[in-house]
């Protein structure tokens, strides 16, 4: 097809020829970025026959991800769990973290152990699915002559492996801060041994409150007002025109997600639980949605997309602005401590 011709012909052009084309046809400069992207990866473009073969294998190669998605979002069911008083609580992907945030340690332990015991019952299926994913990644990396699957994964984002390695090294070099935080959490919770089901529950008690979706939207709008009237007007339109699928439902995928489609606008998936964490999730995902909307509005389709390393800047910025707003508004020391500890645990957990 035309796309294959495009990928084969562009790398063959010399830099001088391209410079002349840009000078003779200035409208081509709109496509300079995608052209450079194709040429940058010329060493990994194969013969027409090989490219056709890899293209036809693409749908098959997506099978591990598709299988896991159907299993996890549609077929998997968790049994109810009991709290310290013996009452049953529903366990789903959407309720898992809120249950782990409970002050009832028995409930936290039961939720954690039941969740992973249920997944463990499918360990062989999950292992085989993961193995299939590894094999397809290795196949395409080898086929395109990358030295490793890591090089292949990072190439599209133009992030050197050295940057990836330095991030890991930086985390390891600063683990002493994490150890201090974990020790503080264990001491404040008053437990002899800190378990994974203890790392979500607030260590400043009696501060968490129910925050409705309407309240959360209003607070997020206030917090992001510093970004200007144009931004908040479009954000309000996104709320009012139902860009968001808000509440959990049977068969709905867990977590939160923002689609980056250009028309008519991005769509945001949430699993609202009416708490502070959900409020931050709204700010985070609408950061993605606004980024996509504004990028598509002000740039041509060929340059409007962005890589994950850039995407998380917009979403994390919104979270930071929301945290700043909440801290500035609060005068209660306990509430401020709760907010700071929440953000510390979120950073450690990497919920983004």
How would you describe each model-predicted region?
Residues 269-282:
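Short pre-active-site segment immediately N-terminal to the catalytic Zn-binding motif
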Residues 292-313:
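Post-HEXXH active-site segment of zinc metalloproteases
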Residues 207-262, 275-276:
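Auxiliary, metal-adjacent structural segments of Zn-dependent hydrolase domains
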Residues 2-9, 343-348, 352:
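Conserved small/polar residues in nucleotide/adenosyl-binding loops
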Residues 281, 285, 289:
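Catalytic glutamate of the conserved HExxH
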Residues 327-345:
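Long, amphipathic alpha-helical stalk/connector segments used for oligomerization, subunit docking
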Residues 1-206, 217:
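A well-structured
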Residues 306-333:
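Post-HExxH zinc-binding segment in Zn-dependent metallohydrolases
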């Amino acid at each position: 097809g035309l796309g294959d011709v495009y990928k084969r012909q562009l790398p063959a052009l010399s830099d001088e020829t391209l410079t002349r084309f840009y000078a003779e046809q200035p409208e081509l400069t709109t496509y300079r970025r995608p052209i450079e992207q194709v040429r940058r990866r010329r060493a990994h473009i194969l013969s027409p026959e090989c490219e056709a073969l890899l293209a036809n294998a693409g749908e098959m190669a997506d099978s591990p991800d598709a299988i896991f998605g159907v299993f996890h979002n549609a077929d998997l069911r968790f049994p109810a769990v009991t709290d310290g008083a013996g009452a049953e609580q529903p366990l789903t992907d959407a309720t898992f973290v809120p249950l782990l945030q409970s002050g009832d340690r028995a409930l936290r332990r039961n939720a954690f152990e039941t969740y992973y015991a249920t997944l463990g019952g499918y360990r062989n299926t999950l292992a085989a699915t993961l193995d299939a994913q590894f094999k397809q990644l290795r196949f395409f990396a080898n086929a395109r002559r990358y030295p490793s699957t890591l090089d292949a994964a990072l190439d599209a984002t133009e992030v050197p492996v050295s940057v990836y390695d330095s991030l890991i090294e930086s985390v390891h070099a600063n683990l002493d801060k994490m150890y201090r935080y974990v020790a503080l959490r264990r001491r404040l919770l008053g437990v002899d041994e800190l378990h994974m089901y203890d790392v979500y529950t607030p260590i400043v008690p009696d501060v968490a409150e129910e925050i409705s979706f309407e309240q959360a939207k209003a607070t997020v709008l206030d917090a992001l007002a510093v970004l200007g009237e144009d931004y908040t007007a479009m954000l309000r339109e996104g709320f009012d025109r139902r860009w968001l699928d808000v509440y959990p439902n049977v068969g709905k995928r867990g977590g939160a997600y923002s689609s980056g489609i250009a028309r008519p606008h991005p769509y945001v998936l949430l699993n609202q639980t009416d708490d502070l964490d959900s409020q931050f999730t709204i700010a985070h995902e609408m950061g993605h949605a606004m980024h996509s909307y504004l990028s598509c509005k002000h740039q041509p389709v060929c340059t409007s997309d962005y890589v994950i390393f850039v995407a998380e800047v917009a979403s994390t910025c919104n979270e930071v602005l929301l945290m700043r707003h909440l801290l500035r508004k609060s005068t209660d020391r306990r509430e401020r401590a709760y907010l700071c500890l929440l953000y510390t645990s979120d950073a450690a957990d990497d919920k983004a």
